[in-house]
């Protein structure tokens, strides 16, 4: 089986780039730099796959094309490789990842389903199908797929991170924290890095983001990563986390509170004037 990149948790949700249709009068009131420019449609820009190319060469070329976001061309090359290696779970998973990057969720799910039909123990495919469900806000089935992935591979930080995001979205905060903690134990950089495929870690919706940042700050503090804890505390503060005062009593922050940078951070809090 060919190597298979994983999809992590989304520093911003994959659906965060919706365009709003606004009255034409509005656009006359804003500068050109503030206007939203509609992206051109996806196009094929390179020659089609050569009929005599090997499956390995086609797959390697598809990887290169996907890395530079030429997704339609990448799909052509992956599918040409798949024609030479029918029912390859690795190729089906990579096709699904590419479709996921294009936000073609129905097609991506179908590809992951086919992948799992070819290989029922393909942990990455369960995780990636869970991402599709997460983006469709089907958090319950996303949780089930993430747990299936973890049952097959308990060493992947991204699986636990994705599980935490789905539980967080369901407002199941305590089990979400447990999942996030395991993710950090496996990879302290799990919330910072992007996967080899370019999809960032899934994160909760904007409405839950402040609480999420505070939760991550607490996890990093508990594990002794003061720099990262302070970074996420700053984010929670900037996003107006309503229970930020808990930082003074939560035992996990005991070490962080002794850091001079903590005092500098809380000094930046806006003063709320009484009405």
Q: Which ranges hold each PLM region?
A:
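Helix-start (N-cap) detector for alpha-helical repeat units in TPR-like alpha-solenoids
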Residues: 55, 89-90, 123-124, 157-158, ...
């Amino acid at each position: 089986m060919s190597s298979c990149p994983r999809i992590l948790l989304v520093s911003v949700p994959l659906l965060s780039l919706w365009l709003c249709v606004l009255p034409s009068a509005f656009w006359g009131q804003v500068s050109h730099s503030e206007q939203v420019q509609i992206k051109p449609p996806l196009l094929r820009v390179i020659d089609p796959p050569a009929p005599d190319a090997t499956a390995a060469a086609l797959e390697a070329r598809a990887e290169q094309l996907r890395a530079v976001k030429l997704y339609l061309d990448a799909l052509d090359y992956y599918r040409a490789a798949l024609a030479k290696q029918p029912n390859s779970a690795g190729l089906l998973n990579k096709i699904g990842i590419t479709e996921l990057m294009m936000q073609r969720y129905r097609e991506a799910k179908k590809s992951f389903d086919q992948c799992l039909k070819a290989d029922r123990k393909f942990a990455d495919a369960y995780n990636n199908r869970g991402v599709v469900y997460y983006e469709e806000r089907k958090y319950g089935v996303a949780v089930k797929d993430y747990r299936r992935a973890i049952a097959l591979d308990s060493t992947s930080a991204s699986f636990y991170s994705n599980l935490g995001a789905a539980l967080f979205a369901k407002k199941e905060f305590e089990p979400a924290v447990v999942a996030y903690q395991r993710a950090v134990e496996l990879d302290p950089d799990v919330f910072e890095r992007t996967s080899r495929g370019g999809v960032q870690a899934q994160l909760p919706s904007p409405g839950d983001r402040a609480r999420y940042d505070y939760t991550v700050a607490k996890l990093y503090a508990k594990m002794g990563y003061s720099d990262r804890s302070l970074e996420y505390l700053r984010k929670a503060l900037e996003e107006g986390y309503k229970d930020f005062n808990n930082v003074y009593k939560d035992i996990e922050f005991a070490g962080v509170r002794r850091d001079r940078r903590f005092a500098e951070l809380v000094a930046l809090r806006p003063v709320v004037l009484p009405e």
